[in-house]
Amino acid sequence: MHTMEVKEYRVGIADLNVAKSPDRIITVGLGSCIGIALYDRINGVGGLLHIMLPDSTQFKNVSNPLKFPDLGIIIMTDKMKEKGANIRNIKAKISGGASMFNFSDKSMVMDIGRRNIEAVRKKLKELSIPIVAEEVGGNKGRTMTLDTSNGIVQIKTVGVGMKEI
Protein backbone atom coordinates (compact mmCIF):
# COMPACT_ATOMS: atom_id res chain seq x y z
CA MET A 1 0.00 0.00 0.00
CA HIS A 2 1.33 3.42 -0.95
CA THR A 3 1.18 5.91 1.90
CA MET A 4 0.90 9.54 0.95
CA GLU A 5 3.72 11.74 2.10
CA VAL A 6 2.55 14.35 4.60
CA LYS A 7 3.92 17.81 3.94
CA GLU A 8 4.20 20.37 6.71
CA TYR A 9 3.64 24.02 5.82
CA ARG A 10 4.87 26.84 8.06
CA VAL A 11 2.97 30.03 8.76
CA GLY A 12 4.90 33.08 9.93
CA ILE A 13 3.56 36.13 11.74
CA ALA A 14 1.00 38.00 9.61
CA ASP A 15 0.98 35.05 7.22
CA LEU A 16 -1.28 32.19 6.16
CA ASN A 17 -1.16 28.85 4.45
CA VAL A 18 -3.85 26.60 3.00
CA ALA A 19 -3.48 22.85 2.44
CA LYS A 20 -5.39 19.70 1.55
CA SER A 21 -5.54 16.41 3.45
CA PRO A 22 -3.25 14.86 4.74
CA ASP A 23 -0.87 17.83 5.03
CA ARG A 24 -0.22 19.78 8.22
CA ILE A 25 0.07 23.53 8.81
CA ILE A 26 2.01 24.94 11.77
CA THR A 27 2.55 28.37 13.30
CA VAL A 28 4.86 29.14 16.21
CA GLY A 29 5.19 32.11 18.53
CA LEU A 30 1.54 32.88 19.23
CA GLY A 31 1.66 35.38 22.09
CA SER A 32 -0.94 38.14 21.90
CA CYS A 33 -1.35 37.10 18.24
CA ILE A 34 -4.13 34.68 17.29
CA GLY A 35 -3.87 31.55 15.20
CA ILE A 36 -7.08 30.90 13.28
CA ALA A 37 -7.49 27.37 11.94
CA LEU A 38 -10.34 26.91 9.48
CA TYR A 39 -11.32 23.44 8.31
CA ASP A 40 -13.77 21.95 5.81
CA ARG A 41 -14.02 18.30 6.88
CA ILE A 42 -16.11 17.25 3.86
CA ASN A 43 -13.57 18.48 1.30
CA GLY A 44 -10.44 17.98 3.45
CA VAL A 45 -9.25 21.57 3.10
CA GLY A 46 -7.68 23.53 5.95
CA GLY A 47 -6.13 26.92 6.46
CA LEU A 48 -4.14 28.59 9.21
CA LEU A 49 -3.78 32.36 9.64
CA HIS A 50 -1.55 34.14 12.19
CA ILE A 51 -2.97 37.62 12.92
CA MET A 52 -1.28 40.33 15.01
CA LEU A 53 -3.64 43.27 15.43
CA PRO A 54 -7.40 43.57 15.93
CA ASP A 55 -8.51 46.14 13.36
CA SER A 56 -7.17 47.26 9.97
CA THR A 57 -9.43 50.34 9.93
CA GLN A 58 -7.14 52.00 12.51
CA PHE A 59 -4.39 52.25 9.88
CA LYS A 60 -4.17 54.52 6.84
CA ASN A 61 -1.86 52.24 4.86
CA VAL A 62 -2.23 48.50 5.27
CA SER A 63 0.96 46.98 3.88
CA ASN A 64 0.03 43.44 4.92
CA PRO A 65 -3.69 42.59 5.25
CA LEU A 66 -2.79 39.26 6.92
CA LYS A 67 -1.94 41.15 10.13
CA PHE A 68 -5.67 41.66 10.73
CA PRO A 69 -8.65 39.31 11.19
CA ASP A 70 -11.08 41.61 9.36
CA LEU A 71 -9.04 41.24 6.13
CA GLY A 72 -7.00 38.07 6.66
CA ILE A 73 -9.92 35.70 7.34
CA ILE A 74 -11.58 36.70 4.03
CA ILE A 75 -8.31 36.13 2.13
CA MET A 76 -7.97 32.71 3.77
CA THR A 77 -11.54 31.60 2.98
CA ASP A 78 -11.02 32.68 -0.66
CA LYS A 79 -7.82 30.61 -0.87
CA MET A 80 -9.62 27.65 0.73
CA LYS A 81 -12.44 27.93 -1.84
CA GLU A 82 -9.80 27.82 -4.62
CA LYS A 83 -8.70 24.44 -3.16
CA GLY A 84 -12.27 23.12 -3.16
CA ALA A 85 -13.63 24.15 0.24
CA ASN A 86 -17.26 25.17 0.69
CA ILE A 87 -17.75 28.11 3.08
CA ARG A 88 -20.86 26.42 4.54
CA ASN A 89 -18.75 23.49 5.79
CA ILE A 90 -16.02 25.56 7.42
CA LYS A 91 -15.50 25.42 11.18
CA ALA A 92 -12.95 27.40 13.18
CA LYS A 93 -10.55 26.67 16.04
CA ILE A 94 -8.61 29.56 17.53
CA SER A 95 -5.63 29.90 19.82
CA GLY A 96 -3.47 32.67 21.28
CA GLY A 97 -4.48 36.09 22.54
CA ALA A 98 -2.26 35.89 25.60
CA SER A 99 -1.36 38.90 27.73
CA MET A 100 2.40 38.61 27.38
CA PHE A 101 3.38 41.55 29.55
CA ASN A 102 2.40 41.98 33.16
CA PHE A 103 1.93 45.71 33.58
CA SER A 104 0.33 46.88 36.79
CA ASP A 105 -1.98 49.06 34.70
CA LYS A 106 -3.62 46.71 32.18
CA SER A 107 -5.36 49.55 30.35
CA MET A 108 -1.94 50.98 29.52
CA VAL A 109 -1.29 48.23 26.98
CA MET A 110 -4.94 48.16 25.88
CA ASP A 111 -4.65 44.39 26.32
CA ILE A 112 -3.99 43.59 22.65
CA GLY A 113 -4.46 39.85 23.23
CA ARG A 114 -8.01 40.28 24.51
CA ARG A 115 -8.84 42.73 21.71
CA ASN A 116 -7.48 40.27 19.15
CA ILE A 117 -9.70 37.49 20.56
CA GLU A 118 -12.79 39.73 20.37
CA ALA A 119 -11.98 40.87 16.81
CA VAL A 120 -11.50 37.29 15.58
CA ARG A 121 -14.77 36.13 17.19
CA LYS A 122 -16.62 39.09 15.64
CA LYS A 123 -15.32 38.47 12.10
CA LEU A 124 -16.02 34.72 12.23
CA LYS A 125 -19.55 35.43 13.48
CA GLU A 126 -20.11 37.90 10.60
CA LEU A 127 -19.08 35.16 8.16
CA SER A 128 -21.27 32.55 9.96
CA ILE A 129 -18.22 30.39 10.67
CA PRO A 130 -18.72 28.64 14.03
CA ILE A 131 -15.84 28.44 16.51
CA VAL A 132 -15.90 24.81 17.66
CA ALA A 133 -12.88 24.98 19.98
CA GLU A 134 -10.54 27.57 21.41
CA GLU A 135 -7.48 27.83 23.63
CA VAL A 136 -7.07 31.55 24.29
CA GLY A 137 -5.91 34.05 26.90
CA GLY A 138 -3.48 33.35 29.70
CA ASN A 139 0.07 34.69 29.56
CA LYS A 140 2.09 31.97 27.77
CA GLY A 141 3.22 31.57 24.17
CA ARG A 142 1.77 28.81 22.01
CA THR A 143 2.50 26.75 18.89
CA MET A 144 -0.48 25.61 16.82
CA THR A 145 -0.62 22.75 14.29
CA LEU A 146 -3.62 21.90 12.07
CA ASP A 147 -3.86 18.36 10.72
CA THR A 148 -5.90 18.60 7.50
CA SER A 149 -6.61 14.86 7.47
CA ASN A 150 -8.96 15.16 10.47
CA GLY A 151 -9.22 18.82 11.56
CA ILE A 152 -7.45 18.19 14.86
CA VAL A 153 -5.46 21.15 16.15
CA GLN A 154 -2.54 20.54 18.49
CA ILE A 155 -1.65 23.39 20.84
CA LYS A 156 1.75 23.35 22.52
CA THR A 157 1.88 25.89 25.35
CA VAL A 158 5.24 27.04 26.72
CA GLY A 159 5.83 25.39 30.11
CA VAL A 160 2.48 23.58 30.02
CA GLY A 161 2.64 20.94 27.29
CA MET A 162 0.51 19.61 24.45
CA LYS A 163 -3.26 19.68 24.08
CA GLU A 164 -5.60 18.72 21.25
CA ILE A 165 -8.65 20.80 20.39
UniProtKB/Swiss-Prot annotation:
Probably deamidates glutamine residues to glutamate on methyl-accepting chemotaxis receptors (MCPs), playing an important role in chemotaxis. GO terms for molecular function: protein-glutamine glutaminase activity. Pfam families: CheD. Belongs to the CheD family. It catalyses: L-glutaminyl-[protein] + H2O = L-glutamyl-[protein] + NH4(+). InterPro entries: CheD-like_sf, Chemorcpt_Glu_NH3ase_CheD, Cytotoxic_necrot_fac-like_cat. It comes from Clostridium tetani (strain Massachusetts / E88). This is Probable chemoreceptor glutamine deamidase CheD. HAMAP family: CheD. Its EC number is 3.5.1.44. SUPFAM superfamilies: CNF1/YfiH-like putative cysteine hydrolases. Keywords: Chemotaxis, Hydrolase. GO terms for biological process: chemotaxis.
